[in-house]
Amino acid sequence: ILSMLLFGAGGIIALYISGTDVTIPAHYHGSTVGITIGLMCFIYMIFIEYFNMEQSKGMKWQLITYTIGQAIHITGLAWSGGYGALRKNHGEILSVKLKISMGFMGAGGLIAIISGLTFIIIVLKCFYKINKFK
């Protein structure tokens, strides 16, 4: 469900693209992250179904925090695009509204990065458990 929500958000944001602002990355981040979440769930399902591991609270919370982080990230990008923030325009003087929306985007990105690293740690622990019992 989380995967479909973000994929759908990416599709809806695509309807609002009207130039070369940061609405474009908001669209493709929504679409690709939706697929990424689906693949994360698939990896967890493999560990649970084929290697008889229990679903940990960490798995559940990692998916939730990754989704929330990316949703904030995408919202910040779309919000900034609504104010006309251009892509790849370094050194531009930003208004306070743009700084706030880009800060929102950055905060969501940071949450998603930390959660993505958590995914790697969880997967490595699962591989360790598999090799430990062989």
Name each model-derived stretch.
Residues 1-134:
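Hydrophobic alpha-helical transmembrane segments of multi-pass integral membrane proteins
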